[in-house]
């Protein structure tokens, strides 16, 4: 028994900042950004547009795509690093926006690996029989954590949200397997300079880029190889590889090491930048909207985030 995605939806704020526009207030240039990251632009939420608003708009699309009633949802999980408030959770605010009553809702924080963590948790809860229809969302306003004077980080991130509706599968489609990991000894590679119990502020993103690149390749590769081996899959069985959209160099290097054909690799980092927990569901939504994906296709997800946290998932569409 497993669970499957019956609907998906993505939302990106309408405001776009190109690399050229960044050069007006950051010491950088388009070539430098493109060469190192593959990013051409990023979507930026407005001052009065919060993570809960992004989540709501993507949730509406996923509910419509799944062709269900909002009242069919019996659990909400939002994966986010950028909540509107320290409390209550973004999920409970969304609960109110959707007009729901009494069903549980909570946030999950595993940074860029959040969607993989959330997917494994949602799967377990559905398979247990406790819940039938789960709304799982990755939603981030990453620009709220940026130091716009730090060109090594401010060029990398964008805002957005991606949602999926999960239900029990009655056939061979759905989540085949997933794995998640963490390594707390590596937290100083990527973190924020603040927190509510530390100094009462959210802080700004601090990153050791070269170390993170090495860890990303090593850990994502091992996670993927473990998944394939455990489920007797080969790389040639994969129809679409949807990695976390952090950096084009990481994506390309993984594809090279795994020997995955170029047309199978889903890349949205060019236009979305790094949307943290939202990046995989946003990329999935874009792939689905393209009309390329078909029933029976095998999808491979892979992500790594601060913590460090990482993991992967195999899905039969």
From Swiss-Prot:
Instruction: Indicate the quaternary assembly.
Output: Homodimer.
Subcellular location, record wording: Cytoplasm
The coiled-coil regions, if any, are: none
Enzyme Commission number, as recorded: 2.3.1.180
Q: Describe which pathway this protein belongs to, using the record's wording.
A: Lipid metabolism; fatty acid biosynthesis
The family database entries (PANTHER family) matched by this protein are listed as: 3-OXOACYL-[ACYL-CARRIER-PROTEIN] SYNTHASE 3, BETA-KETOACYL-[ACYL-CARRIER-PROTEIN] SYNTHASE III
Q: Which domain of life is it from?
A: Bacteria
GO biological process, alphabetically ordered: fatty acid biosynthetic process; secondary metabolite biosynthetic process
Reactions that this protein is recorded to catalyse: malonyl-[ACP] + acetyl-CoA + H(+) = 3-oxobutanoyl-[ACP] + CO2 + CoA
**Organism, as annotated:** Rickettsia prowazekii (strain Madrid E)
Pfam families xref list: ACP_syn_III, ACP_syn_III_C
What is the protein named? Beta-ketoacyl-[acyl-carrier-protein] synthase III
Q: Which GO terms describe its molecular function?
A: 3-oxoacyl-[acyl-carrier-protein] synthase activity; beta-ketoacyl-acyl-carrier-protein synthase III activity
Domain comment, in the record's words? Answer: The last Arg residue of the ACP-binding site is essential for the weak association between ACP/AcpP and FabH.
Active-site annotation = 112, 244, 274
């Amino acid at each position: 028994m497993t669970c499957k995605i019956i609907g998906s939806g993505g939302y990106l704020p309408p405001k776009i900042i190109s690399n050229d526009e960044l050069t007006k207030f950051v010491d950088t240039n388009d070539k430098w950004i493109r060469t190192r990251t593959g990013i051409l632009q990023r979507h930026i939420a407005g001052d009065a547009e919060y993570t809960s608003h992004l989540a709501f708009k993507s949730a509406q699309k996923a509910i419509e795509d799944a062709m269900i009633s909002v009242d069919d949802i019996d659990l909400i999980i939002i994966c986010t690093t950028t909540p509107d408030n320290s409390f209550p959770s973004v999920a409970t605010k969304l609960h109110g926006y959707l007009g729901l009553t009494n069903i549980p809702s909570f946030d999950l924080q595993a940074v860029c690996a959040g969607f993989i963590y959330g997917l494994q948790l949602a799967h377990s809860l559905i398979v247990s029989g406790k819940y039938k229809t789960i709304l799982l969302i990755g939603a981030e306003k990453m620009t709220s954590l940026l130091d716009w004077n730090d060109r090594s980080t401010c060029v990398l991130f964008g805002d957005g949200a991606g949602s999926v509706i999960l239900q029990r599968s009655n056939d061979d489609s759905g989540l085949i397997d997933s794995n998640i990991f963490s390594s707390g000894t590596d937290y100083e590679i990527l973190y924020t300079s603040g927190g509510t119990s530390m100094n009462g502020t959210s802080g700004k993103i601090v990153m050791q880029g070269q170390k993170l690149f090495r860890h990303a390749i090593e850990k994502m590769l091992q996670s993927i190889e473990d998944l394939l081996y455990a489920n007797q899959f080969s790389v040639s069985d994969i129809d679409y590889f949807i990695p976390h959209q952090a950096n084009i160099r990481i994506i390309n290097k993984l594809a090279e090491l795994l020997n995955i054909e170029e047309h199978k690799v889903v890349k949205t980092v060019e236009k979305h930048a790094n949307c943290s927990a939202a990046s995989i569901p946003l990329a999935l939504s874009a792939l689905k909207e393209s009309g390329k994906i078909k029933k029976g296709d095998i999808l491979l997800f892979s992500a790594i985030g601060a913590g460090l946290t990482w993991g992967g998932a195999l899905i039969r569409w």
